[in-house]
A protein has these predicted regions:
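Short pre-active-site segment immediately N-terminal to the catalytic Zn-binding motif
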Residues: 17-34, 94-99
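Acidic/histidine metal-binding catalytic segments
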Residues: 52-56, 79-81, 116-126
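Acidic helix-start/capping segments at beta-turn-to-alpha-helix junctions
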Residues: 1-4, 54-62, 125-132
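Catalytic Zn2+-binding segment of zinc metalloproteases
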Residues: 40-57
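Membrane-active amphipathic alpha-helices enriched in small hydrophobic residues
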Residues: 60-76, 83-92
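Extracytoplasmic and endomembrane cell-envelope/extracellular-matrix remodeling and assembly machinery
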Residues: 91-92, 97-170
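Catalytic zinc-binding patch centered on the HExxH motif and its immediate surroundings
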Residues: 2-14
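Short alpha-helix carrying the canonical HExxH Zn2+-binding catalytic motif
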Residues: 28-44, 64
Length: 170
């Protein structure tokens, strides 16, 4: 995609989109491959389909949360009580997103290693992403992020790579 921002995504039907910024910000093939392996993991783990199923499961909980917050707002004469229900719903959706991201990191890392790439490639790419975020001044609170905070992802990836041989890797 003709866009200089660092991004890639997986979509239903086996589609992976890659912004031009990935080419600009990956220092080597292994780092580029780490992003693709992450996106392929979203597809292989059926995250889009599982998210739809989870949304169905959450619909009853969501309805109860909204009814409760409306009742609380009416009985307490505090309209801000509605925000509690909305915050709960958003938190539940983000929780599933973060779980899927962590799973995609883990499965993507395993596939990256099986493909013969340097185990440190994923952590190094996360460092690049974190550096770009800092330069852009983008640091929303972690509870608002769909992706785990980059420093957490860097640590997880580097710890997974610890002790794995870099010899003979791409």
């Amino acid at each position: 995609i003709d866009d200089s921002s660092l991004n890639a995504f997986a979509a239903p039907g086996g589609i992976i989109g890659v912004n031009g910024g990935l080419f600009l910000n990956a220092d080597n093939e292994g780092q580029f491959a780490s992003v693709l392996s992450h996106e392929l993991a979203h597809l292989s783990q059926r995250h889009f389909a599982r998210n739809i199923l989870n949304a169905k499961d959450r619909s009853l909980t969501s309805s109860l949360a909204m009814i409760s917050s409306i009742a609380l707002a009416l009985t307490s004469s505090n309209p801000q009580a509605l925000a509690v229900g909305q915050a709960f719903l958003q938190t539940q959706g983000l929780r599933y997103s973060r779980l899927f991201e962590k799973e995609a990191d883990r499965v993507g890392f395993a596939n990256l290693i099986r493909a013969g790439y340097d185990p440190k490639s994923m952590g190094e790419m996360f460092e690049n992403m974190n550096d770009l975020r800092k330069l852009a001044g983008e640091a929303p609170p972690e509870f608002l992020l769909t992706h785990p905070l980059s420093s957490s992802r860097i640590n997880d990836a580097m710890n997974a790579a610890e002790g794995l041989s870099r010899e003979g890797t791409k």
